[in-house]
Amino acid sequence: MPEQKANCSPNGNITVDSMIMSLGSS
């Protein structure tokens, strides 16, 4: 689950992950 890793990383990767998640959900 790399999504959780990005969420834990305060590198602003949350936004990118959110976009990827949204695209994958589409």
Swiss-Prot record:
Disruption phenotype: Confers sensitivity to osmotic stress.
Chain spans, region Disordered: 1-26
Polar residues: bias regions: 1-16
Domain of life, per lineage: Eukaryota
Protein name, UniProt field: Uncharacterized protein YNL040C-A
Organism classification: Eukaryota, Fungi, Dikarya, Ascomycota, Saccharomycotina
